[in-house]
Amino acid sequence: YFMREGGVNTLEAQVLVPLQEHTEMDFNIVAAGERLNTIEAYNKMSLLSYNREMDYYVVTRALACFERTLISGDSPYDQYHFQNKNSALSEMEIRGMNLFFSNRTNCGNCHGDFNFTNYAFENNGLYAVYEDQGRFILTSEETDREKFKVPSLRNVGLTAPYMHDGSMSNLEAVIEHYNIGGHVNLNKSPLITPLNLNGNEKEDLIAFLHTLTDTKFINNKLLKP
């Protein structure tokens, strides 16, 4: 599922959201296809790849196809964990990694697996009362109230602001939120409890999170406009 409340179930459908959303591009997918069809280069590629002129069908499929190539997997953490390059992480970063995956913090319970997400919907106690009701809007299930999709942490050092509403400007604020155990909320995940981290431990965690930055992926010229 895509989007923070999980309201979109395919990449092809997800393409429509930023394109047509009023607060983003505010454009019509049909009109977008028609405009691109006037550009000879795009029309040639469309005929070659999809055997049809550029239109809304091609726009959604082509963009989704490109998005499926955006796979990040060569960060310092990947080099250390998957490629057995012990020198890829510093002692500080290794301490942070061990803390991240420990039963003390439970970070890895939600942010595990290759993409550092369990793909579930959780309430992390960001607020005692949320303005946005999250997944509840779609399901009307009380157990889904104020729950949002657990995001991937890959390249998280570059994706501020954080939380579903962008209310935290840096990783220090995020770590402190989890350190105090979030706010009291009926649907808050039972995994989120006070961590009682000291200053050095917070710095270790943040150092580890920065090891998830894949500079090779970020600087890939083929992925730039």
Residue ranges and their predicted role:
Residues 1-225:
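Periplasmic c-type cytochrome electron-transfer domains
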